Amino acid sequence: MILQIIKLKSNLPEEELLKRAKEREPQFKAIPGLMQKYYTKSDQKGAYAGIYVWDSQESFQSFRDSDLAKSIPEAYELIEAPNIETLDILFQLRK
């Protein structure tokens, strides 16, 4: 399994950012291999993160190459390039 963390900064009001995230939710639910996605926010103004859990490297790579992934900066009107971190999950506590 793969854990992907996409940290982003946006000047959108939180309500608008959440509205856009909810509108895009069905597209993310339809992604093969995406086991879970967490929508999170930082204590810093305008700082958010999407935390993704992928079933395989192939699913993760397929998403990275997708139009949906490439649309993230525009959809949330990012003010700088997102910070993306990818980690291999060694094991999980609960299943």
Indicate residue ranges for each PLM-predicted region:
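Short S/T/G/P-rich N-terminal loop/turn motif that feeds into the first structured element of a domain
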Residues: 1-48, 55-65, 78-95
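A common structural junction motif
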Residues: 70-74
